[in-house]
Every structure is written in C-alpha cells, then in structure tokens.
Amino acid sequence: ALATMNNGREVINKVYQGKVGWLNWQRPGFDLGLKMENLIEKNKDIMGIVLGHHGLFTWGDTSKECYSNSIQLIKRAQTYLNSSIKKYSFGKPIYKKKTQPDFEEKLIATIRGLLSKENSKILHLDKSDITLEFVNSQNLKKVAAVGTSCPDHFLRTKRLPMVLPSLSELIKNENKINKIIEENLTKYKNAYAKYYMRNKSKGSPNLRDPYPVIILIPEYGMMSFAKNKSTARVSSEFFCNAMNVMKGAEGISKYTGLTEKEAFRIEYWDLEEAKLKRMPPEKELAGKVALITGAAGGIGSATANKFLSEGCCVVLTDIDTSALEAKKEEFIKKFGKDVVH
C-alpha cells in the first residue's frame, strides 16, 4: 500500500525515519541492481528499500536476519496503516449485499457461457469482506480504472477489471440480461484491443485473449475466469491482494498505478511471454464441468477418474452419501480440491 501512494517516498520516510530507502518503479534487471547498490552505498544504515509500485527489499548477513528485518519493517508499516487509515477508504458504501439464488445461477451461467464461446473457461466466485467493501463503494469505478497494484499480477488478472451494473439493476433487466452482458464484454474486448494497438512495438508478442479475467458486480461480489479452476482461483486471490493494497493507499493518501505504457511493457514483456510458452498445453477437457451420477460406484467412479485426468472439473453425486464422501476425498487427494465437488 505504501509503495502505491502518490506520495509514497514521503510516507516511507515518515514511517521508517530514514531507515528505508526509496526507488521509483522500473522493471527488474541489471540497471535496477546498480541503482540499489548505489543507494545502499550512499545510505549505509538503511535496512531495506521500497521499489515504487512493487514492494520491499530487505537483506542481512544471514537468512534469519534478513527475514527478521523484513518482518520488523512490515509490522511497522502495518501499525502505521492501522492507526492512520480512514473509515471509508473507497468512499461511503452506496450498495448493500444482495442475495437472489435463482437469478444468481442464471447470471453465472450467462456470463460463463458468453466468455466460453471461443475457449471454455471456469469461474471462481469471491464474496469476501474486502471484495464486498470494494464493489459496494462509492469510488468503485474510479479506483478500478487505475489498474491493479502489482506488475507481477498483470498476467493473472489483466491490468483492469470489468465492472458490471449492480445485481439489483441486472435483476430489474432480467429479460435483457444476455444483451447487457454481451455489450459490456464487447466494450471491454474493444478497449483491450485498442490498449494493445496503442502500446505495441516491433517484436511485441501477439494480442492475447482480450476478454476480462476479473468481473466486479456491486451488491454481489467478484467473478474470475480462466482456462482451469486453480488459475481462476489464484487470479481471484491476486485481485483480493490488489484490493487490500488499494484500500491502504486510498485510506491514507491516493492510490496510483503504473502508466498504461509501462503496464503494457510488463504484460507483454518477452520474459513473461517466455513463461507462457513454457507452460504445458491444456488437457482436452480443461474449462469443462461434468455432473456425474452414481459417482461412488464402479462405472461412475471410473468415469470421474477419466474426466479428472483430462482436466475436467467434476460434480459428484450418489444416493450412497457415505461412499460418495469417501470417493470424493480419494479424488481430492489425487487431483486437488479445486476440481472435485
């Protein structure tokens, strides 16, 4: 949070009383290493360095000392945030949490269906306290438009989320729900394509999937989408971290993001592209969900095992509930809890 404030250097000096240095953001590499070395040479008493829009570097003669220094500095920052943050970091709440299960099921199916036209995707839903505080706030759209907090997150979450109308508004227009969602997705897709065209240079990797990863809905929560469940969940966790950073920065000062150009340079960095190319190909049923009846029996169990081994998420059912629970635990141990329900 301190690293993303518009007066971050000033706040760092105030919190650490000269014991922590500051460097403006730049991509990791040899030049950044030289700047850090130069800063340490000129300030031999500092315990760490904050890199703007990124985070904290600490060191020590031993790994234990380095860890201890890191914990000490983080606790000092947390104490400052806790004592200084205002009540409504994102502005006063203008929405309240709302629940309407039948419509929510339709909404989830509609959004996932529209996002899966070209490539099947899996949804992760988050209704945590920080998510509801953010999506129900007065300044949701303004803060969301600044972009996510940490450059490391861009590949997971994209720079910007998509913000939909409130759940009440969507319910009121239930008969036009497909049109509303499709229009918002098209708007996001076109804006992302323009962002790519504005910032690409010779040798830039090709345009990636232009659709949103993170979708925010006032009164409801956050949806994240990816080609598999674990990636969707991690993307959600990353954006929860981003919202906490935004809350800290907005609650004391003003949250700032990287420039659009620099954000693009990170998102489409050759090193990041190399990471993507090294990832194993998706399995045949990645992005799919299967409902399996009689899953505790021989045929159902074998079917579930085959689907899971091909990357599918499965929902297991059986009239023998005790046998079903045992089989479910067996599959969770083998394939992970993200894909077994």
Question: Can you say where each PLM-predicted feature lies in the sequence?
Answer:
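Conserved glycine-rich Rossmann-like NAD(P)H-binding loop of the short-chain dehydrogenase/reductase
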Residues: E310-K327
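Hydrophobic anchor at the start of a short beta-strand
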Residues: I214, V314, T321, V339-H341
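Rossmann-fold cofactor-recognition segment
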Residues: F331-H341
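Short, well-ordered alpha-helices that flank and scaffold nucleotide-derived cofactor binding pockets
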Residues: N38, N305, S309, E329
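Canonical Rossmann dinucleotide-binding motif of NAD(H)/NADP(H)-dependent dehydrogenases/reductases
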Residues: K283-V315
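Glycine-rich flexible loops
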Residues: A1-A290, A302
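A generic structural signal for alpha->beta connector loops
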Residues: K19, D45, G311, K337-V339
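Generic hydrophobic, amphipathic alpha-helix propensity
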Residues: I299, L324-K327, F331
